[in-house]
């Protein structure tokens, strides 16, 4: 299964602030968004719109896709002006088309105009991510394989982009560096090898009371064998072709772990129980070929780093 979200997890070696809750992270993002956009006030709106002017605006969808971010939009309005009233007609996860009205907001016109761009930036971004994810996951219809996101996200918006991936039907990989151990080539090189890196990870988890999945990135059959013998929860096949992936999946599934190791090491599994992830250069056109190899997950950075926002507007009504 994908790494679980643990917002309270942080290592004693960290030199940043302790992890914040979901709501705190969103509030911090909105505080920054208002600071950089509104500043000490919208000069145009404050100079042209009377303070007591009341009105309504509606969010109009202009492109087909998956709607995401409605509840975050509500937080935008509530944070700026708690008296704004939002009436929702289309919720997160819905398939939308041009002309659909997702919600109507009424209240002070000054508040509507000053929250418009921040709300649209978030909604367009999240809906774009959800729409892209839906397109990828749809290519895997009928297969067990799940599309995963990555850490290639917009700084400050990771939480929202990963929520959008789930809204679009995908699954989340680790949220950050804190909620899963993913041993990559650099870790292996610095640790002195795969057995050393995996054992060090297990020792660290035990010493620090961490119950984290351990995943290992591999590049060839020899590294697959070392991963299986070391005992890991998931193996990432990095930049394998579909042909090599099929061979690797068959090889992993046939592995039988020693009974003593199975009994003593919770990260040790028979090959049929090891999660397998494909990663590296996989496009929407090659996605299904990898899924048909029988992998459990395919991680795709493009879900968040190369996405186009879904077109929509916020107009007076």
What are these regions (language model features)?
Residues 16-230, 234, 246-251, 274-278, ...:
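Acidic/glycine-rich phosphate/pyrophosphate-binding loops and surrounding catalytic core
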Residues 239, 280, 302-303:
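Short secondary-structure boundary segments
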Residues 258-272:
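Intrinsically disordered, low-complexity segments enriched in serine/proline and basic residues
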């Amino acid at each position: 299964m994908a790494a679980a979200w643990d917002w309270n997890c942080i290592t004693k070696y960290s030199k940043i602030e302790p992890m914040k809750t979901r709501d705190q992270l969103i509030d911090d993002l909105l505080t920054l968004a208002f600071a950089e956009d509104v500043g000490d006030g919208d000069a145009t709106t404050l100079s042209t719109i009377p303070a007591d002017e009341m009105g309504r605006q509606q969010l109009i969808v202009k492109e087909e896709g998956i709607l995401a971010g409605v509840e975050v939009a509500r937080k935008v309005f509530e944070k700026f002006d708690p008296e704004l009233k939002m009436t929702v007609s289309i919720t997160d996860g819905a398939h939308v088309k041009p002309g659909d009205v997702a919600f109507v907001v009424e209240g002070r016109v000054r508040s509507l105009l000053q929250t418009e761009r921040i709300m649209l930036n978030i909604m367009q971004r999240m809906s774009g991510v959800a729409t892209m994810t839906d397109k990828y996951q749809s290519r895997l219809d009928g297969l067990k394989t799940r599309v995963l996101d990555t850490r290639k996200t917009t700084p400050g918006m990771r939480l929202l982009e990963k929520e959008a991936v789930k809204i679009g039907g995908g699954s989340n990989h680790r949220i950050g560096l804190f909620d899963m151990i993913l041993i990559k080539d650099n870790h292996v090189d610095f640790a002195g090898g795969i057995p050393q890196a995996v054992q060090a990870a297990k020792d660290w988890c035990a010493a620090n009371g961490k119950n984290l999945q351990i995943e290992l990135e591999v590049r060839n059959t020899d590294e697959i064998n070392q991963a299986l013998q070391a005992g890991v929860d998931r193996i990432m096949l990095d930049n394998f072709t579909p042909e090599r992936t099929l061979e690797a999946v068959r090889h992993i599934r046939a592995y039988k772990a020693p009974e003593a190791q199975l009994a003593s090491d919770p990260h040790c599994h028979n090959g049929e129980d090891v999660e397998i992830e494909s990663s590296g250069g996989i496009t929407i056109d090659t996605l299904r070929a990898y899924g048909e190899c029988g992998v459990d997950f395919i991680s795709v950075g493009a879900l968040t780093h190369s996405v186009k926002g879904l077109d929509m507007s916020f107009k007076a009504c």
